[in-house]
Amino acid sequence: MSFVPEKVFFTKGVGRHKEYLSSFELALRDAKIEKCNLVTVSSIFPPKCERLSVEEGLKRLSPGEITFAVMARNSTNEHNRLIASSIGVALPADESLYGYLSEHHPYGQTSEQSGEYAEDLAATMLATTLGIEFDPNKDWDEREGIYKMSGKIINSFNITQSAEGEDGLWTTVIACAVLLP
């Protein structure tokens, strides 16, 4: 049996609680996907996969459903510790080809830094599979221009959640690409 997702939506959340597991549950609730049995998968954006809004995607989920997702997750119980979770996305111009989703879960990076890193990672993985020549030592903005000017990569973006740890609590952040039939 083959299952290639045809739809995807992106969501994120943050949770805080005195218990580690409960902070994760609250992050799932914030992302509105707590009712699913999540199965994490690796990072391929399926060919011809349609992006849905969070609201449209949630309508397709049922409580207890086995749900596939690419998830970036990070937690801390350190006061003022900055954490982030990002999903980077890179899509080919040719929709019959697959794209990439990357997960990044750093400490000490802002949302912008984490998101840019994840997006860069996804775009670089896609560029190497498409045979786009580039200098990996150039900064992201320059490589992004090369990738898009090649005509082979049409879009890249990220979804990121960051937060600072609070005294006496676990803080968990998640970013997810939820894959649907």
Swiss-Prot record:
Entry cofactors: pyruvate
EC number(s) reported in the record: 4.1.1.19
Keyword list, A-Z: Decarboxylase, Lyase, Pyruvate
Domain of life of the organism encoding this protein: Bacteria
Pfam family for this entry, one: PvlArgDC
GO MF entries: arginine decarboxylase activity
InterPro entries named among the record's database cross-references: Pyr-dep_his/arg-deCO2ase, Pyr-dep_his/arg-deCO2ase_sand, Pyruvoyl-dep_arg_deCO2ase
Residue numbers of Pyruvic acid (Ser) PTMs: 43
Site label Cleavage (non-hydrolytic), positions: 42-43
Reaction(s) catalysed (UniProt annotation): L-arginine + H(+) = agmatine + CO2
GO aspect biological process, one term: arginine catabolic process
Cofactor note: Binds 1 pyruvoyl group covalently per subunit.
Keyword Lyase: yes
NCBIfam families, per database record: pyruvoyl-dependent arginine decarboxylase
PANTHER family with a match to the protein in the record: PYRUVOYL-DEPENDENT ARGININE DECARBOXYLASE (PTHR40438:SF1)
Family assignment from sequence similarity: Belongs to the PdaD family.
Name recorded for this polypeptide: Probable pyruvoyl-dependent arginine decarboxylase
